[in-house]
Design a protein with these regions (language model features):
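A short, amphipathic beta-strand motif
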Residues: 27-36, 118
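Short, acidic, small-residue-rich periplasmic hinge/interaction motif at the N-terminus
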Residues: 48, 90-92, 112-155, 177-179, ...
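Primarily recognizes Gram-negative and organellar outer-membrane beta-barrels
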Residues: 202-205, 225-267, 281-723, 727-961
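Short, polar/charged loop or turn motifs at beta-strand boundaries
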Residues: 149-172, 194-199, 261-265
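Short Pro-Gly-centered beta-turn/loop motif in secreted/extracellular proteins
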Residues: 68-86, 160
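Structural motif
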Residues: 32-43, 140
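A short, solvent-exposed loop/turn motif at the edges and junctions
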Residues: 55, 78-80, 84-105
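Periplasmic plug
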Residues: 181-226, 242-249, 282
Length: 961
C-alpha cells in the first residue's frame, strides 16, 4: 500500500513539473540566416535574442542540420515565454546590422518555432563603384532568394534564337530535365505553373516545347503549402515542390503556335499545326497532325514516339483540343480535352513455336499479315462548381467511341520434327505450296490457312460526381462519390478457313465459311464514401466503403455459311458476303452460340492506418497497413442449344498491404523499405460453368466447376545508402501463387487439335534482385562526367503448367525454369560542349525444363546505345547509334547483329526551324521477341518501320512579336 502511495506521489510531482515547464515556456526556435546578395547560408554572424526592451534574452548557437535533403547551417535558441522579441544579427566587416522584430504565442501542441529565413544586406564596397566598365546589364544577378523561394532571372541566361522554355531551364543551376520530368536539386517538381496557374501541369510538353525564353521574366521554385486564400479549390489543395514560370507583363495574355511540314524518302511524310491561347483565366490549345512514321503526337506529360522499337507500319491522323477555364471568384473551374484519331496499321509477323509434351515436342511455323483501320473519339472533362464555398462539388463526364476494321490472313503448320532448320528463308514458300512436298509432308500433322475480316465498334461512357468536406483544425476529411457507367461492344467477324490433316489420313480437310456476330453491354452504378482523420502529428486512419451494382449482357451468334450449297468455296462468295436472312438463320450453330446475363452486387471496405515519425521535416520511420475486404454476389443465366442454366455465388476476397520504412538523417542517409502484399483472385463465372466450345477446328475450350480461388504472396525489400560518389541501392522481391488459375492442355497428335481447360496449379514463383550504383560527380571544367550508373540484376522464374496428350490418361506438370542475369551500365560525358551518353545492356538467359526432349536455352542479348548531342549557337546535332546482337535462338534469322542509327540536324531561326531527320540509317532494325513457359517456346519477328530520310520545316508565330 505504501509503495502504491509513493508511486502516485512521484507521478503527481512529475506531472506538476511538466505542466510548470510548459507554462513557463522554454520553447526552442530556429532560423536560417542568408547572404542577401547570393542567397548562400552564413554561419559567422553574431545572433542575439532580445526582448521588447532590447534586453538580451539568449545567444543563438549555429549548428549543421539537415534541411530539404541537404546539410545547412541553422541558428537555434530558446524562447522563455509568449510575447514580443527582436532578433539582432551583426557582422560588421561585411553586413549592415539586421533587426528582426517578431511576436510569438506558445502553444502546448508546439515542439519548435521556426522563423522565416533572414537575408542580410551587404555593405557598399568602394572598389566596386570605381569600376566604370562594369554595368548592371552586363552583370545581371542570375538568381536570388526571397525567403524560402529561389528566383531565377530569365534575362540573365543567354539563349540562341529559336530556343524554347526547356532550353532556358537547362541553363539554370540546380535544375535538370529528364524528358518532361523537371528536377530541382535532384527532387522532382510536383507542380509546374505558368503565371501562377497550373493549366499545363498535366501536359508540360505544351509549354516546355513552345514558350520562347524572351517571354519569361523569372522562374520561381518553392515548396508550396496548402493555400487557404485562393478562390480556386484546385489551387488551394496544391502542395509540394512547385515551379512557377512568370511571364513578362506584356505577355500575360498571348497567342502563339507553329506549323510543321516534312517530306521524306520511301513516301514518308508528316505535318503538324499547333496553337495555344493563354490568359489569367483560361487556356486553350489545339494540335492537328498526320504522319506515316509511327509517331504519336501528344499534348501530355510525356511525349511518346513509337518508331524506335515499335512494331508495325502505322499511318496516323490526329486532332487534340485541351482547355481550362477558371472563374475569377471561384464559382466554377472547368477543364477537359477532346481527341479524334484515325490509324491505318500494317503488321507482318513470322512465328516459330515449340510445344512441350512428354511423348515428344511439336514444332510449328506460321506467318501473319494484317491491316487494321480504326477511328477513335474520346473526351474527358472535370467541372468544379462553387469551389469557394462549402457547397462545392465536381462533375466528371467522359465518353469514348471506337470503330475498327480488320483484314488479315495467316498460314501455319505443325510437325512432329523440326523440319525447318535446313530450309532457311525458303520455309514460307515451301509452306505456301498447294500441296506439301517432302520432307514436310511426311512429318506434317496439319496445315491451316485463314482469311478473316472484322468490323465493329465499342462505346464507353461514364459520369462521376464528387463531394468532400474538410475540417482542417480537427484533421478530418469526408468524401462522397457517385459513378454511373455504360459500355457497349458490337463486332461482326467473317472467317474463311481451311485445315488439311496429314498425320491421320482418315480425316478429310475442314473447310469453313463462318459469320460471327457478338454483342455486349454493361450498365453499372457505384457509390463510395471515405473518411480520413489525423490522430495527432504522427498517426492517421482512413476507411473507404464502396457499393456497386452492375448488369452484363453478352450474345454470340455463330453462323456456319459453308453448310449452304455453293458457300463452301470462298471464290464464289468472297469474304464479307452474307446470304438471305432466312438462309442465314438456318445455319446457326446453336451449340457454340450463347446468350448470358449476369447481375453483380459488390460491397467493399478498405481500412488504412499510417504512422509517420519525422525529424526536421524528413520522415524517419513510417508504417502503413491497408486491409481491403470485398464481398460480392453474382448471378449468371447462360443458355444455348445444349445448356440452359442459372448459377449464383457469394464470395469474399481479402487483401493485405503492409509496409515499413526507415530513413537516417545526415550527410550519408540510409533508406530502408519493406513491404508485404497478400491478395486473392477468383475464377470468372463462365470458367466455372461446364460448357464446351469447338467453333475453332483446332481448338476446344471447356469450363471447370471445381476451380478454387488463387492466393498471391509478395515480399519486397529496398535499401539505399549515400556514398561519397553517389548512391548505392539494393532491391529484391519474391512472389509465389497458390492455386494459380492456369490453362491445362490436352493435345491430339493425330489431328493437331488442342483441348484447353482452366485448372488450379501450385508452384509458380518469381524472384528478382538487383544492385545499382548511381554516381554523383561535380561538374567542373569543359570535360566532366555528367552521370554514371551501373546495375546488376538477377531474375529467377519458375513456370508450372499442365499438359498431356490424348493417349495419356493423367496430366503431367511441365516445369520450365528461366534464369536471367543482366548488367546495365550508363555514362554521360560532357566534352567541350558535346554530350555523349552511352548505355549498355548485356543479358544472359538460361532456361531448363523437365520434359525429356527439352533442349536447354542459352541465349545472349547485347545492346550498346550511344547518344551524341552537340549545340553550337543556333545549330543542334544529335545521333543515336545502337548495336544489338542475339545468340541462342532456334530461328536462325534472329541470331544476327544489328547496327542501328538515327540522326538529326536542326538549324534554329527566330521564326522557323529547319530539320533533317535520318531513321535507321543502315536499314537493319528488327522486331525480335522470345517467350518461354511450361507449355512451350515462341519466337517472333514483327515488321517495323524501315529506313527513311526526311526534311522538316517549322514556322512559328506569336501575336505579340
Amino acid at each position: 500500500m505504501e509503495r502504491r502511495r509513493l508511486g502516485f506521489l512521484l507521478l503527481w510531482c512529475f506531472m506538476c513539473m511538466t505542466c510548470q515547464a510548459q507554462k513557463n515556456g522554454d520553447m526552442p526556435f530556429s532560423v536560417v540566416i542568408r547572404d542577401g546578395s547570393t542567397g548562400e547560408v552564413v554561419w559567422y554572424v553574431n545572433a542575439l535574442l532580445l526582448d521588447a526592451d532590447s534586453a538580451v534574452v539568449d545567444t543563438l548557437k549555429c549548428d549543421r542540420v539537415l534541411r530539404k535533403s541537404s546539410m545547412e547551417y541553422e541558428y537555434s535558441g530558446i524562447l522563455p515565454k509568449s510575447g514580443k522579441y527582436i532578433l539582432k544579427c551583426t557582422f560588421d566587416r561585411l553586413f549592415t546590422p539586421l533587426f528582426f522584430p517578431f511576436e510569438v504565442e506558445l502553444r502546448k501542441s508546439q515542439r519548435m518555432v521556426r522563423l522565416p529565413d533572414l537575408f542580410m544586406k551587404r555593405k557598399d564596397e568602394p572598389q566596386a563603384q570605381m569600376l566604370q566598365e562594369v554595368e548592371v546589364v552586363a552583370t545581371k544577378l542570375k538568381f536570388y532568394f526571397d525567403k524560402d523561394t529561389v528566383v531565377y532571372n530569365a534575362d540573365a541566361f543567354k539563349t540562341v534564337a529559336g530556343s524554347v522554355l526547356e532550353d532556358l531551364l537547362k541553363k539554370m543551376p540546380d535544375i535538370q530535365l529528364k524528358g518532361n520530368t523537371i528536377l530541382y536539386k535532384g527532387n522532382p517538381v510536383r507542380n509546374l505553373l505558368l503565371n501562377g496557374k497550373d493549366f499545363f501541369n498535366r501536359d508540360r510538353h505544351t509549354i516546355l516545347k513552345h514558350i520562347p525564353p524572351y517571354m519569361v521574366k523569372e522562374v520561381r521554385v518553392f515548396d508550396k503549402k496548402e493555400d487557404s486564400n485562393s478562390l480556386i479549390k484546385r489551387e488551394r489543395e496544391m502542395r509540394g515542390l512547385t515551379m512557377d514560370v512568370r511571364l513578362k507583363k506584356e505577355y500575360s495574355t498571348f497567342f502563339l503556335g507553329d506549323a510543321t511540314a516534312g517530306l521524306g524518302t520511301d513516301q514518308r511524310y508528316m505535318g503538324q499545326i499547333f496553337g495555344l491561347a493563354f490568359s489569367s483565366r483560361m487556356r486553350l490549345s489545339g494540335l492537328a497532325s498526320l504522319n506515316n512514321v509511327n509517331k504519336i503526337p501528344v499534348m501530355s506529360y510525356e511525349e511518346s514516339y513509337q518508331n524506335w522499337g515499335g512494331f508495325g507500319d502505322c499511318a496516323r491522323d490526329n486532332i487534340q483540343l485541351r482547355y481550362n477555364l477558371d472563374e475569377p471568384l471561384g464559382l466554377y473551374s472547368l477543364m477537359g480535352d477532346v481527341e479524334l484519331e484515325y490509324k491505318d496499321d500494317l503488321v507482318t509477323r513470322r512465328t516459330s513455336e515449340i510445344k512441350f509434351y512428354q511423348t515428344g515436342d511439336v514444332f510449328g511455323r506460321s506467318a501473319f499479315n494484317g491491316r487494321t483501320r480504326s477511328f477513335d473519339f474520346s473526351t474527358n472533362h472535370s467541372f468544379n462548381f462553387l469551389g469557394n464555398t462549402i457547397w462545392d462539388f465536381t462533375l466528371q463526364p467522359s465518353f469514348r467511341y471506337s470503330h475498327v476494321k480488320n483484314r488479315d490472313s495467316s498460314l501455319g503448320a505443325t510437325f512432329e520434327k523440326d523440319v525447318f532448320s535446313h530450309l532457311g528463308k525458303g520455309w514460307l514458300d515451301s509452306l505456301s505450296l498447294p500441296v506439301l512436298t517432302e520432307p514436310l509432308r511426311s512429318d506434317a500433322i496439319n496445315r491451316r490457312t485463314v482469311e478473316e475480316m472484322e468490323d465493329g465498334h465499342s462505346l464507353d461512357a461514364s459520369l462521376r460526381l464528387d463531394k468532400d468536406l474538410t475540417w482542417k483544425q480537427a484533421g478530418q476529411n469526408l468524401q462522397f462519390s457517385l459513378i454511373a457507367n455504360y459500355k457497349e461492344n458490337k463486332h461482326r467477324t467473317y472467317y474463311h478457313g481451311n485445315v488439311d490433316y496429314y498425320e491421320n489420313p482418315s480425316l478429310s480437310s475442314d473447310r469453313r465459311n463462318n459469320y460471327n456476330l457478338t454483342k455486349y453491354n454493361k450498365r453499372g452504378i457505384e457509390g463510395a464514401i471515405s473518411y480520413k482523420r489525423k490522430l495527432g502529428e504522427r498517426n492517421d486512419v482512413s476507411f473507404i466503403y464502396r457499393s456497386s451494382h452492375s448488369s452484363n449482357e453478352d450474345n454470340r451468334a455463330l453462323y456456319l455459311l459453308h453448310l449452304l450449297d455453293g458457300w463452301e468455296d470462298s471464290a464464289s462468295h468472297p469474304l464479307g458476303e452474307l446470304p438471305s436472312t432466312s438462309e442465314l438463320f438456318s445455319t446457326l450453330d446453336g451449340a457454340n452460340s450463347h446468350d448470358y446475363q449476369k447481375l453483380q452486387n459488390d460491397n467493399s471496405l478498405n481500412l488504412n492506418y499510417r504512422y509517420s515519425y519525422k525529424e526536421n521535416r524528413q520522415e524517419k520511420y513510417g508504417v502503413s497497413i491497408n486491409i481491403p475486404l470485398k464481398l460480392y454476389h453474382e448471378k449468371l443465366h447462360y443458355s444455348n442449344q445444349l445448356i440452359d442454366t442459372t448459377a449464383s455465388r457469394t464470395n469474399v476476397i481479402t487483401r493485405v498491404d503492409a509496409s515499413f520504412s526507415h530513413s537516417t538523417l545526415g550527410e550519408k542517409p540510409i533508406k530502408l523499405w519493406f513491404s508485404y502484399n497478400f491478395s486473392q483472385s477468383s475464377p470468372s463465372m463462365l470458367q466455372l460453368l461446364n460448357i464446351r466450345d469447338n467453333s475453332d477446328p483446332l481448338v476446344i475450350t471447356e469450363g471447370n466447376p471445381h476451380l478454387k480461388n488463387a492466393a498471391s504472396h509478395y515480399f519486397g525489400l529496398y535499401l539505399s545508402k549515400r556514398i561519397p560518389y553517389g548512391d548505392i541501392s539494393f532491391e529484391a522481391n519474391h512472389q509465389f501463387v497458390d492455386n494459380q488459375i492456369a490453362t491445362s492442355r490436352v493435345y491430339n497428335r493425330l489431328s493437331g487439335v488442342t483441348r484447353y481447360r482452366p485448372q488450379n496449379i501450385d508452384g509458380n514463383n518469381t524472384t528478382r534482385a538487383s544492385v545499382r550504383w548511381n554516381g554523383r560527380f561535380k561538374r567542373k571544367g569543359k570535360i566532366h562526367i555528367s552521370n554514371f550508373s551501373n546495375q546488376w540484376s538477377v531474375h529467377l522464374n519458375k513456370n508450372v503448367d499442365l499438359s498431356t496428350t490424348e493417349e495419356n490418361t493423367d496430366f503431367t506438370q511441365s516445369v520450365v525454369r528461366n534464369r536471367y542475369l543482366t548488367n546495365m551500365t550508363g555514362i554521360g560525358i560532357s566534352l567541350y560542349g558535346i554530350l555523349l551518353v552511352t548505355n549498355a545492356e548485356v543479358e544472359f538467359r538460361h532456361s531448363t525444363g523437365n520434359s525429356p526432349r527439352f533442349q536447354d536455352i542459352n541465349a545472349w542479348k547485347v545492346q550498346i546505345g550511344n547518344t551524341i548531342k552537340y549545340e553550337y549557337k543556333s545549330w543542334r546535332a544529335s545521333s543515336e547509334i545502337k548495336y544489338e546482337r542475339y545468340w541462342g535462338y532456334n530461328h536462325s534469322p534472329m541470331n544476327k547483329g544489328l547496327l542501328l542509327c538515327n540522326m538529326e540536324l536542326v538549324r534554329k531561326f527566330s521564326k522557323c526551324d529547319l530539320k533533317l531527320e535520318v531513321y535507321d540509317l543502315f536499314n537493319q532494325y528488327k522486331g525480335v521477341d522470345m517467350y518461354v513457359n511450361g507449355q512451350g517456346k515462341i519466337e517472333t519477328i514483327t515488321n517495323i518501320l524501315r529506313r527513311y530520310l526526311m526534311f522538316q520545316l517549322t514556322y512559328k508565330f506569336n501575336n505579340k512579336k
